[in-house]
Amino acid sequence: MNVTIFNVATGKVESLVSGREEDINAMLDGGQDCIEGHFYPKDFYINAGEPVAKQAQPTPNHIFNYVTKQWEDPRTLQELKDAQWASIKRSRSQAEYAGFMWDGSTFDSDAVSQNRITGAVTLAQLSSAFTIDWTLATNQVRTLNQSEMLQVGAALGVHVQTQFAKGQSLRVQIDAATTQAEVEAIVW
């Protein structure tokens, strides 16, 4: 016999057991009962002796409340704000490293590419005769002169600063939020 043992007061599934009926009944304490079949605690609770499927867990942080029969996020407002800010920073980095456009060409902007652009800008500042064949994000090659290389460097700077300015604006909104819903509404 396969059964699910549950807490009668809350409906929380406490264990799944297989065995003889008399052995299973001997395992039950005063606040427990069982129903036939295996209903996994991650997916079910018991209501009036019947298994009820839980809704999908919204996030790994949510905990099922057996009184309200709903998923709840137990984090404090500050913990929610900290988590949202961490998410915003990840999105900001992704946007920063996703590349940028200048004069119809897409340039890489990951950390290594930013260093390469900075180095090329430094070289361009040393000679008005500067030229370089630059491999674009599309793997096409574009020849840049001194003026163009300096403009690419400036465009990179604007691109990075734009991402950080957006992040700073979102941080102000996160700090000002007073409810979980307000915090969750702030996205990249």
Where are the regions that the model predicts?
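A preference for well-ordered globular domain cores
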Residues: 2-30, 48-188
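Metal-dependent nucleotide-binding catalytic modules
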Residues: 29, 34-42, 46-47
